[in-house]
Regions:
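N-proximal low-complexity "stem/linker" segments adjacent to membrane-targeting elements
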Residues: 3-35
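Active-site-proximal specificity loops/subdomain of glycosyltransferases
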Residues: 49-92, 111
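Conserved catalytic core of nucleotide-sugar-dependent glycosyltransferases
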Residues: 66-70, 107-143
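Short beta-strand-to-loop acidic/aromatic patch adjacent to the donor-nucleotide binding site
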Residues: 94-107
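Short, polar loop motifs at secondary-structure junctions
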Residues: 18-20, 42-48, 64
Length: 143
């Protein structure tokens, strides 16, 4: 008898915003719900007080201070670094964290299944290498 294991990858989308609720955020909120993904939005001091999501989890500036992370208490206001609070929240319950911005509109295939299995190249050279950040699959060797 052979055992078969099925792993369900839990996904979450994390964004930060200082803006009012816009169509992009509404789309992420609705479509995340449809595909059973979590949606986490991290607000800031400038985020409107009446900001609310229908399905996702919104953390206001004040909500973040109540979290059990030291970073959430020391992270400066009005900083993109606050997105890290969303990552900390998401690491607890999710396998895949998808990062995007509130001004990006999700393309049609954005919500298709994701995998953590990727084709890679084996590095034979034992010398120092540099991975090019603009193309993570291209590797250049340094001699």
């Amino acid at each position: 008898i052979r055992s078969v294991y099925i792993f369900i990858m839990r996904s979450v989308i994390v964004i930060t915003t200082i803006n009012k609720l816009n169509q992009n955020i509404i789309n992420y909120d609705l479509k995340s719900k449809k595909v059973n993904w979590k949606f986490v939005v991290i607000g800031d001091k400038k985020t409107p007080k009446n900001f609310a999501l229908k399905y996702g989890d919104y953390y206001s500036f004040q909500d973040q201070k109540k979290l059990n992370f030291k970073f959430s208490k020391i992270c400066p206001p009005n900083s993109y670094a606050r997105k890290n609070i969303g990552y900390l929240i998401s690491f607890l319950e999710n396998d895949i964290i998808i990062e995007t911005d509130d001004d990006n509109y999700p393309k049609k295939n954005f919500f298709l299944g994701r995998t953590n299995i990727h084709k890679t190249k084996k590095i034979e050279n034992k010398s120092w290498i540099n991975t090019n950040i603009s193309d993570i699959f291209r590797i250049s060797h340094r001699h």
